[in-house]
Amino acid sequence: MKMNFSQIFTSIHSYIHSYHNIPNEIDKIQLLMDNNTTIKANFEFKQENLYASFCLNEELPITTKLKAKFGQYFSNNAFIIKIKPQMSEDKLIYEYKIILNDISFSHQKSSPKYNIAVLKKHKNMHLLDNIIANSLTNIAFNFCGNNFHIYIDNSLLVILCETQMKADDFLEYINSIKMALDFLNTELSGEIMYIFSANLENFAVNHCKIILLAPNTRLNFNIFIAMNYPIQEALLEALNGENIKIRLNKEEFERLCTLIHSNAQFKTSIHYILESSKAALECVLIYLSVALESNAKYAKGEECLMPKDKFKKFKKQIDCFIDNAKELNENEKSIFKNKIINQIPNSLSLKRPFEQVNMTLTDEELNILKKRNAILHATAIEHSSDIMQDALKYQKEARILYLMLYEFILKTIGYKGYIININKWDEVVEFINSYNDKTSNAIFKEDFVKCLK
């Protein structure tokens, strides 16, 4: 009979969690079945990212219950492991002897080959419209003609592919899935930008105001509020409401993965959006401007101002006019001629992606598009004597551009649900400032949710 996915996931889960304190230097693990069938896996253990690729590339016969031969027995459906440390090229390598217990495999010669990736899960990951990724879950989906299963628990994300393919091809698919998940779980998705931290110890009640500190890595500011009731809890409860969460259904998630995997410009745009979350504030705008350019290249359209035959006649007339201009020397004439090209201006090409998904841009958003070249060449980065005001200005512009790109991508994959409204930010700040310490949690929570919608 076929491999039981849930049993495999349970085994991987037990194995990883049993050795969650493995040193970060480990970069390779060899897994050996007791029947001499070898399963090789390359692990990269890093401080913030856990990744592994299990390649089950051998036919595995039906197994019976196996007696423990190595190490300690962890659970009924788990691995039995013995650690043998080695040194190789200045890197610490561990060899694991493993018995896979109570798991059945196909006995036929046409036994399927499975690829499995293990990744560290985001702390507050939400996936698809009806699944919160904090419980043991097996999700099946398809993209680019391949069937995938996702297993999720409190800290791990395990992705299994049923389709037979080379390990390098499998890693390309995993990279696309991981990029899609990273995009969906940035802190600006699901209105997390509206979650504030309550610091009740350092302020008196009469200091009840909003204090903006340096921006964190996700483009939002930590906002500390001085109140004499647990406002943070009320905010968190309010923000967990279903109506203000971005949740993709399976078809939308499949389209997102497919576009990332199959379109280089779309993938580049997502890449720079994600990279912007790690950059210094002044550099965030530069990363997002590159993503904006990739969007323009992704949204194919007419590249010429006029038909080529019409432009050829027009160019001939202009060249003649330039040749007869006595005020210009030969070098200047040549420069002017080369400047006249049959190409749509950059300002129009940058707007085109948003027009194609019927996004109506505000004056602030249009102004950001006009400043794109200045931002990219750093001429828009100005510094005054007021560092905080500079930070607020860059943060606001970055947030506007980020959410423009975010909304474009969501609309491109057919998402029709809730999308963050950038104009809500100023409303939220004003809303919180209007409340005082006599406001009850229940009233605050109810009004706060209304403010967000």
Sequence positions of predicted segments:
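Residue-identity detector for threonine
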Residues: 10, 37-38, 63-64, 137, ...
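Long, contiguous, compositionally biased segments that the model treats as domain-scale units
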Residues: 1-190
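Amphipathic, oligomerization/interface secondary-structure segments
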Residues: 224-453
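Serine/threonine-rich low-complexity intrinsically disordered regions
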Residues: 4, 11, 46, 60-63, ...
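A broad, low-specificity signal marking well-ordered, structured residues that form hydrophobic/aromatic
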Residues: 157, 208-211, 289
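Internal, Lys/Arg-enriched amphipathic helical interaction segments that engage polyanionic partners
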Residues: 171-252
